[in-house]
C-alpha cells in the first residue's frame, strides 16, 4: 500500500468501527465514532480503538507463514499479499470500490449462512448456486430493512455475479386510538443517512408531493424510530408506504457487481466461484501453517534429544563444563551431538539439571512426536485438510454468532404488496372547484371557485384574459398548441390564484414561436374535431390527447400550417368555412376517427387561402 495521510486512515478506521456501516465491525471503538445521521466521529485524540474478534480471525496465522509477504511501497518493510482470513470477510462484510475502467460492489451477508454454505460446498463440491441459496438466503445489511427482490432475480444475480437487490425500510402500524394510526419506521435501507432522509421527506411535504402524508417526526434514540402520520385515517397503511417508497430513500437499490481479484487478475465471479476460491485459500493456509508448525517441532525435538543425552550423562557433562577449555567441541566429540544441541546444553542452568526436568522433557518429547505424526498425516492427506478447514470454519461461526445481536440475520425478505397506487392517490386528492385562467401573455393559475368575474381578475400590466376553464381540483387539463402538440396538467398542481400565476413555459416545453390555441378539461370519452389551417382534419377521443411528458404529445400533423380548430363534437353535420368565403357542409361520420395524424382533406384551398378561425 502506498502511504496515506492520518486523516484518510482515521476515516477508514472509523468506518470499520460503525456497526451501521460494517456488518461485522473489525474495530472496537471507544468514544464518539459517528452515527447513522451522518454526524462525524470525534477527533482521534479523543477516541480509542482495538481489534474485534472478527479482525483477529482475519489475522489468525499471519505469523505462521500462512500467506506470502511482499515488500511495501518504500521497500523498507514487508506486508502480506492477502490475509489468512479465518472467515469469508469479502462476502460477510461486502466491498465497494472503483478503479480505472472497473468497479466492484458486493453486498454484506450473514456469516453463519455463508459459512454453512462453504462447509456444504466442502461436502458437496458439485452443489449448484440454487443449492447454496438454501443457506445464503440473500444479503444481510447492517441496518436491517426488508429485501423485496424475487428469489429468481437473486438466483440469477448469484449465478452471474451481477444483479441488484431492492431494499425497503421496515415499518409497523401503531394504533393511536379512535380509529387513527401512525406508522413507525424502525429500520432504514443500508447506506441511507437518516438526517438526509428526513430532510427529503420534509421537502416533499412542503412541495405538496406527498398527498397521503400529513407529518413526519424523528423520535429516535439509540434505535431508529421515525413516525409517519397519515393525512386521513381512511388512508391504507400499505398505500401510504408504497407512495413513500416511490418518492424517497425509504426504498433503495443495491447493485451487485462481484468483480474481484482472483490469482492477481480481476474477474466477475458468482457465489459458488467466490466460495470455492476462498475454500482453496483456506486449505492452502492450513497446509502452510502445518508445515510451519512441523518445522518448529522438528527443531524443538532436536534440542530435546540433546537434553536427554545430557541428562543420561549428567556427571560427565558437568565435568566437561567445569574442566575443559572448549566444552562445546568436547561434548560434540564425546556424545556425537550437533553444534546447536551443544550450545543449548551449555545455556542450561546447572540448578535445572535434576531428575524432574528429565521427566518433563521426556513428556514434552512424546507429545511433540505425536503432534508431528498428525501434522505429517495432515500435510499428506487432502481429505484431512478439508476436514480441518471445515472444523475451523465451524469454530469461526460459533465465535461470530456467540452474540445474537451480531450473529442473527438482520434483513428480512418479503414480497412487495400489490397496491393500486394511482387509484389510491386519485381518491385521496381533495375535490374543490377551480377556475383555470390563462392570460394572453402565457401566465397560468388556478383560482378557487367557479363563476369567475373577468373584470375583477387582475393581470400584469398590458396583459389580459385569454382562456379560462371551470374544473375540479381532481381534473386534468389539456392544452393544445398551434404546432399540434397536446399537453396535460394536473389542476391541483397549478399555482394559486393570489398572484399572477407562473409562465406556462415553466410547466410545459413550448417554443417561443408556438401559441396555445385551446384549453379544456379532460373527459376521457368526449370527442373533438381537430383541423389545421391547410384544410386537413379528423376526430380524436380526448383520452388519446393525454400525456405525462413535459414535452407533450404530437397529436396533429399540421404540415405547413398550424392547428386552429379544436372543438367538441356536437350534432351530426360539419360545416367548413375557408378564408375564401366558401363553405362546405358534410356528415360528421365521413370524418375519420384517429389517435393522431394529419386527417382527411376538409376543403381545397388555393394560394394564400386557409381554413378560417
Segments predicted by a language model, with ranges:
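C-terminal interaction appendages of subunits in large macromolecular complexes
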Residues: 96, 102-613
Amino acid at each position: 500500500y502506498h502511504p496515506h495521510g492520518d486523516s484518510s486512515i482515521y476515516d477508514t478506521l472509523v468506518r470499520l468501527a460503525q456497526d451501521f456501516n460494517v456488518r461485522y465491525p473489525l474495530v472496537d471503538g471507544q468514544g464518539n465514532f459517528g452515527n447513522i445521521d451522518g454526524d462525524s466521529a470525534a477527533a482521534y485524540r479523543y477516541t480509542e480503538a482495538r481489534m474485534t474478534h472478527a479482525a483477529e480471525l482475519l489475522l489468525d496465522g499471519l505469523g505462521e507463514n500462512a500467506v506470502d509477504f511482499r515488500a511495501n511501497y518504500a521497500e523498507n518493510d514487508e506486508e502480506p499479499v492477502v490475509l489468512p482470513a479465518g472467515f469469508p470477510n469479502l462476502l460477510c462484510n461486502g466491498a465497494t470500490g472503483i478503479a480505472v475502467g472497473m468497479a466492484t460492489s458486493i453486498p454484506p451477508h450473514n456469516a453463519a449462512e455463508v459459512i454453512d454454505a462453504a462447509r456444504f460446498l466442502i461436502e458437496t463440491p458439485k452443489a449448484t448456486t440454487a443449492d447454496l441459496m438454501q443457506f445464503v438466503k440473500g444479503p444481510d445489511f447492517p441496518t436491517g430493512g426488508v429485501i423485496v427482490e424475487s428469489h429468481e432475480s437473486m438466483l440469477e444475480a448469484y449465478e452471474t455475479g451481477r444483479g441488484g437487490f431492492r431494499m425497503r425500510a421496515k415499518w409497523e402500524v401503531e394504533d393511536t386510538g379512535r380509529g387513527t394510526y401512525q406508522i413507525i419506521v424502525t429500520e432504514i435501507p443500508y447506506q441511507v443517512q437518516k438526517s438526509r432522509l428526513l430532510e427529503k421527506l420534509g421537502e416533499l411535504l412542503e412541495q405538496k408531493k406527498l398527498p397521503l402524508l400529513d407529518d413526519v417526526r424523528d423520535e429516535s434514540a439509540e434505535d431508529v424510530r421515525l413516525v409517519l402520520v397519515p393525512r386521513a385515517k381512511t388512508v391504507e397503511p400499505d398505500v401510504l408506504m408504497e407512495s413513500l417508497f416511490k418518492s424517497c430513500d425509504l426504498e433503495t437499490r443495491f447493485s451487485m457487481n462481484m468483480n474481484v481479484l482472483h490469482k492477481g487478475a480481476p474477474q466477475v465471479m458468482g457465489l459458488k466461484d467466490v466460495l470455492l476460491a476462498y475454500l482453496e485459500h483456506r486449505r492452502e493456509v492450513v497446509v502452510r501453517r502445518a508445515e510451519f508448525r512441523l518445522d518448529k517441532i522438528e527443531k524443538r525435538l532436536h534440542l530435546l534429544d540433546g537434553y536427554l543425552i545430557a541428562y543420561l550423562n549428567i556427571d560427565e557433562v558437568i565435568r566437561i563444563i567445569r574442566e575443559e577449555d572448549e566444552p562445546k567441541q568436547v561434548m560434540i566429540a564425546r556424545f556425537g551431538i550437533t553444534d546447536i544441541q551443544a550450545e543449548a546444553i551449555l545455556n542450561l542452568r546447572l540448578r535445572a539439571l535434576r531428575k524432574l526436568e528429565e521427566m518433563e522433557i521426556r513428556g514434552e518429547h512424546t507429545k511433540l512426536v505425536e503432534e508431528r505424526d498428525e501434522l505429517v498425516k495432515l500435510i499428506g492427506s487432502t481429505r484431512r485438510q478439508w476436514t480441518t478447514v471445515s472444523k475451523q470454519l465451524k469454530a469461526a461461526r460459533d465465535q461470530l454468532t456467540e452474540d445474537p445481536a451480531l450473529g442473527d440475520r438482520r434483513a428480512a425478505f418479503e414480497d412487495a404488496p400489490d397496491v393500486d397506487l394511482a387509484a389510491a392517490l386519485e381518491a385521496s386528492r381533495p375535490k374543490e372547484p377551480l377556475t383555470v385562467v390563462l392570460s394572453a401573455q402565457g401566465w397560468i393559475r388556478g383560482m378557487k371557485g367557479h363563476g369567475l368575474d373577468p373584470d375583477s381578475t387582475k393581470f400584469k400590466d398590458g396583459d389580459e384574459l385569454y382562456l379560462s376553464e371551470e374544473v375540479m381540483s381532481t381534473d386534468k387539463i389539456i392544452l393544445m398548441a398551434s404546432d399540434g402538440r397536446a399537453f396535460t396538467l394536473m389542476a391541483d398542481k397549478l399555482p394559486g390564484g393570489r398572484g399572477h400565476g407562473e409562465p406556462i413555459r415553466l410547466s410545459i416545453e413550448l417554443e417561443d414561436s408556438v401559441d396555445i390555441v385551446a384549453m379544456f378539461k379532460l373527459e376521457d370519452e368526449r370527442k373533438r374535431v381537430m383541423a389545421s389551417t391547410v384544410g386537413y382534419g379528423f376526430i380524436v377521443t380526448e383520452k388519446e390527447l393525454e400525456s405525462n411528458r413535459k414535452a407533450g404529445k404530437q397529436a396533429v400533423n399540421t404540415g405547413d400550417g398550424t392547428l386552429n380548430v379544436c372543438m367538441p363534437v356536437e350534432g351530426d353535420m360539419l360545416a367548413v368555412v375557408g378564408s375564401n368565403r366558401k363553405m362546405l357542409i358534410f356528415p360528421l361520420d365521413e370524418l375519420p376517427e384517429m389517435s393522431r395524424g394529419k386527417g382527411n382533406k376538409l376543403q381545397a384551398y388555393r394560394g394564400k387561402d386557409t381554413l378560417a378561425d
